[in-house]
Amino acid sequence: MLWIFDLDNTLHHASPGVFPHINRMMTDYIIRHLHVDEDAANRLRQHYWTRYGATLTGLVRHHGVDPRHFLRHTHPLEDLLPLVETDPQVAWTLTRLPGRKVLLSNGPAHYCAAVLTRLGIDRHFSAQFGLEHIRFAPKPSPHGFRAVLSRLRARPGQSWMIEDSADNLKTAKRLGLNTVWLAPGEPRRPAYVDHRLNRLSDLVRLVR
């Protein structure tokens, strides 16, 4: 059994502090390197995120931005790590899940590794796949999912994707993975979602 985890808003709550800071850094980067004002930079950032699943993809495709330079300057660990909120239930959950656990994130590798360490759960993961490891093709692109399955020689039917993004799970389901949507308070469950959970710790119930 293979458990594939997203990072932000799945293993930790990124929306309160981490995401707003990253968004500000991305906007500042666009202002400096594309020479546009703040309103235009915000529009571009949001447009590319909506269209491609990551602002970076649009900047690379349409403006020739160096992806590594962008990721390094928009994910400063000295600013972001103090904003990461830890939850002991996450480690408790990972300990009780049988099989391998890996990370598949649209974040850069240095950020993923640092956040897992900050959360105290890095030892649970046998592999980590950040954007650099999947050729900068972010979810919901199928490339990242296929890369994980191929490199780990895992079967889709024996693999589980745990995500807060329904769009990403749509791709995972199309590829044959089992899908778990972490969506607190969400009443609906789309056909491509096998399980909808309010809390990550509810995963343990799926293997009892």
Model-derived features: positions:
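Conserved residues at beta->alpha junctions
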Residues: 9, 103-106, 163
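Hydrophobic residues in well-ordered beta-strands that form the structural core
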Residues: 13, 103-105, 181
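Short glycine/serine/threonine/alanine-rich loop segments
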Residues: 36, 65, 99, 154, ...
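Hydrophobic, well-structured mid-protein blocks that either form specific transmembrane helices
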Residues: 74, 78-105, 115-116
